[in-house]
Every structure is written in C-alpha cells, then in structure tokens.
Amino acid sequence: MTPATARDATERDATDTDVVIVGAGPVGLTLANILGLQGVRTMIVEERATLIDYPRGVGLDDEALRTFQAIGLVDKVLPHTVPNQILRFFDGNRRLLAEMAPPDARFGWPKRNGFVQPMVDAELHAGLARFPHVEVRWGHRMAECEETADGVTVRLDGDPTPVRARYLVGCDGGRSATRRLMGVSFDGTTSPTRWLVVDIANDPLGHPNSEVGADPARPYASISIAHGIRRFEFMIHADETDEQAEDPAFIHRMLGLLVPHPERVEVIRHRVYTHHSRIAGAFRKGRMFLAGDAAHLMPVWQGQGYNSGIRDAANLGWKLAAVVDGRAGDALLDTYDVERRKHARAMIDLSTMVGRVISPTNRRVAAVRDKLIRGASVVPTLKRYVLEMRFKPMPRYEQGAVFHPEAPSPTSPAGTLFIQPRVDTRDAQNVLLDEVLGTGFAVLCWNNNPRALLGADLFDRWKALGARFVAARPLTQLHWTGHDDPDVTVIGDRTGALKGWFDAHAESVLFLRPDRCIAGACIAQRAPEVSTALFGVLHLTQGGGNGHHGADRPVLHVAQSATEPSGTVAGTP
C-alpha cells in the first residue's frame, strides 16, 4: 500500500464529530457545555494530561455567572466564589483613593466575585459528563488542521486516526497553535513592566475584599479569592531580574510589606509575568474560530480576561449550535467577529488605561494622579460612576445578529443584554427570569399575548425553532386566566424591575437570543415586521432545523445558593 492509499484508508476510518475545540481551559469547557446542551457532538482536544490546578483568573462578573446559570452549573460554581467583593484603591500612604462596590445585580448576579479558578474549571469539566456526545481527549496536541469545503480534518500527535468536524474553535490560549495555523496576526503591545504574583493558602490577612496599592515606591495588589486563598502582586523594578524576583528571600521581603510574618505563609505558587494588550486580526477564518486568550489578551486590572473569554463562548456557542442543527445558515457565524471584536477591544483599552493609572513610579506623577482622583470623588455623580462600575463597557451590538429598524440609537435596547430580575409564575415563586426563558430563543411581551401580536404563521415559525413565549404582567394579574394560551408562559413582575425597564423604553416586545441579547425590539403593532426581519438577519431557516433544540426540553432549574447573602440578586425580597 502506498502512503497515499494508506492515508486515504485512514481518512475513511476518521472519527466524525460536529465541533472540535482545541483547549480545555474555561472557555473551551464552557463552549463544550453550551454545545452539549444543544445536542451538538463535540470533542475537546487538550495537550495537557489534566486540568491546570493553580489559580490564574481571580474575578468573575455577573455576565459569566449568568452564562454558568444557562449551562446549569451555577450552583456548582457559587461555593467557590466570594460574592459582592469590594475593590479599594489606596495611595502610597494607604489613604483611600477610590472604591468599587457596585450595588445592583441587574443580570441576576453580583457584578464582582472573587473565585478559585481551578475549582470552577473542575465543575465545568464535570458538567460535560451529562452529555454522551461530548468527549475530552487529554494528552493530545493538534498537529495540523486541513480545511475542506464541508469541514475540517484534524490530526493529533500520536494518533493515526484523524478527526473530521464541521467546525474547529481554538481556545488554546495566548500562544494559540490554532491562530498560527489560521495565519492570523496578533497585534498589540506587551508592557515592559513585570509583576510578581504569589498565591497564598491560609490567607494571612483574612478579610473578604481586595485592594490595589497605587504606591509609587512599588505598586501592589492584594486579592481575596475563596477557601482561604489570597493573591499578592508586586511590581518588579527595572533593576531587579526575574531570577531575583523568584528567590524565596525576595518573595518574603515583598510579602513583608503587607503581612507581619512572611516566613510563615504557605505559598501555593509564584511566577513573574507581563501584561499584554493584543487582539487577533480575525476571530473567524473559514471553518476555524478563535476564542478567549487565543483571540485577545488584556491586562489584569479589570479582571476581564477570563470573563471576556466566557462572553466569547456564550456568543459563539448558540450560533454554532443553530448552524450545525440546521436552524440557521453559515453566515450567522460571521456575526461572531462582528459582535465580539469591538467589545473585546474596549475591554483591552479600559484594562490598559487602568494599569497606567495604577502603575506610575514617579512620585510627582503619582501625586498629581491622587489629587485628580480625590477631586473627582467629591462630585457625587463621578463618585457613583466609579463606585457602581458604570465605566465598564457593556455589549451593544450595532451590527451582527441584531435588527435595527433604522440607524442604531443610543436609547435603543436592540443589541444589549436584557435584565434578569426575579419573577413569579403560576407554578413557582421568586425564580430568575432565564429559568422561564429556557436555553433558546424567546419572545417576551409586556402585558400582551405573543401569539396575538405575531399571528399564527410567525408564531409557529418561532415555535419550530424551539422559542419560548412569555407574557409579562404586573404581579396582580398573574392568576387572571382570560388570555391564557397553552404555548405562552405568564409571569408576574415580582419586583417591579420589568415594569421599570419597559417604562424606560418605548418597545414592549422583545426577541431574545439564547445568550439573552435583545435581537430585536418594537412596539406591539410592529411585532410581525420586526419578526420577519429577524429571520433574515439571524439567517434562520424556514424548516426549524433537525430537532435537537426541541421546545419541550425542560428548563434547567437553578436553585439559589443557601449561602448567598440577601440583596445580592436583583429582586431578592
């Protein structure tokens, strides 16, 4: 047998799957859970033998927790978090400069949460056991990937049997092999400043919050994680080598700046790192995609590297599932880059800017900075702007898988994330809205029946796509049965948050994507025309696909953690 015929025979024996994910980090694991829930055959390829067992990311935001809720794992994640974590900034004399303590939880979860990444990653991995059609291959490195007209063929080191898939997603980190195979640039900068990070067990300070010391002598950070773990970070001066910084005596000297007995601490791990501000030239090329650190890197100062990767998975996951399942055309996948690039760029820029504010080592520059920050804090609106983290860029899609009837307006809700208050149904009380909406598309109307607004044909078309239909009412009307419809769930506005939202917007009908972005919004009379337009911009098919998404799929019940303090979730009574 010639090499060519041997290769052909091997190709015939190839393993078939729908999506190959390269990398079993948090982004790849989250994406695999999203695809698994939608019945998509998925294979994760990871060159390591097991999960990374040391902390990397230390902060989860409300959007990430909402995604973990969507995949049915938030109750597994919450025990490894510190909710409502306050972040304080101090000057070189340990006087308070600013504080971040956002009070609201409009998306259903606290905005700032410390967490232990290895334990959360382990829960994401364990969640895959629910899906017989999802496989993880540990200790396998992707050697090459060949794209064909209808898919990709992946070859793994040490495995003669190739893997055929329709799509491949590189979630393989900043040194992404997928990105290199795609021939995509990774433009940006790497800071010349180095930092020493030290993770400590049995927290020597013990308080629940975090702080950043904008000390020109040596900027530092002290971050409470969970389970008694604390992270310290110290800037390394230009005249200090990496070898010096990793010496135990140097580490003890740094820790001695913040703890009384540095020799007694239990070091989990320490390393020297630099900050990168980079973004890939393309997030999609043919049938290959990039997500997480493979697509973008940002400084740590806003804790958004991990969370940005989870946003990638949430954005791309439902689109891949819809295309693989036949509910949408391949063009829907082009909207991933269109939507995620601008927001990732904004997060990179914000994180880079905050790092520049924190890091000056010139005392005069630091003194001017301190005066400006203190002056701004005297103004109530500016103080709230920082305290409530209003500076954080929120996704607002002007293009992509969204419909704007005219030029996007700053006040239009289309392209933004919808809130997640607590609501009542006829059968349950005090449930988070997403539990009612399910895991697919949803049509939500205030005080109207979606079927009456859409008409029979459009209603049935959304139903064939697995959409759920929800009529929101004031709580006083919850048990009125005059307009009942077996396909429409009636919810009572338990907290008034829904009425408040609709009061602030002209639109009363919302078409929600599976990632809870508002794909389209309109007044009641325009529901049919906006619905029709959405089938076009979402590239949805007429037939409703292959049926994996079934409308009767049970909604995953996510109970509120018993340890969650009152007031951390929007609408908690």
UniProtKB/Swiss-Prot annotation:
Spans traversing the lipid bilayer: none
List the EC numbers from the record: 1.14.13.127
The UniProt catalytic activity note for this protein reads: 3-(3-hydroxyphenyl)propanoate + NADH + O2 + H(+) = 3-(2,3-dihydroxyphenyl)propanoate + NAD(+) + H2O; (2E)-3-(3-hydroxyphenyl)prop-2-enoate + NADH + O2 + H(+) = (2E)-3-(2,3-dihydroxyphenyl)prop-2-enoate + NAD(+) + H2O
What positions does the entry give for FAD binding? 18-47, 283-293
Q: Name one GO molecular function term.
A: FAD binding
What is the superkingdom listed in this entry's lineage? Bacteria
Its annotated function is as follows: Catalyzes the insertion of one atom of molecular oxygen into position 2 of the phenyl ring of 3-(3-hydroxyphenyl)propionate (3-HPP) and hydroxycinnamic acid (3HCI).
Name of the gene this protein is made from = mhpA
Query: Pfam families under this entry?
Result: FAD_binding_3
What is this protein called in UniProt? 3-(3-hydroxy-phenyl)propionate/3-hydroxycinnamic acid hydroxylase
Q: In which pathway does it act?
A: Aromatic compound metabolism; 3-phenylpropanoate degradation
Q: Answer whether the UniProt record assigns the keyword DNA-binding to this protein.
A: no
**Gene Ontology BP term (one):** 3-(3-hydroxy)phenylpropionate catabolic process
Q: Which UniProt keywords apply?
A: Aromatic hydrocarbons catabolism, FAD, Flavoprotein, NAD, Oxidoreductase
Which co-factors does it depend on? FAD
Query: Which PANTHER family does the entry mention?
Result: 3-(3-HYDROXY-PHENYL)PROPIONATE/3-HYDROXYCINNAMIC ACID HYDROXYLASE (PTHR43476), FAD-BINDING MONOOXYGENASE (PTHR43476:SF3)
Is the keyword Oxidoreductase assigned to this protein? yes
Which InterPro entries has this protein been placed in?
3-HPP/3HCI_hydroxylase (IPR023786), FAD-bd (IPR002938), FAD/NAD-bd_sf (IPR036188), PheA/TfdB_FAD_monoxygenase (IPR050631)
Q: Which family does it belong to?
A: Belongs to the PheA/TfdB FAD monooxygenase family.
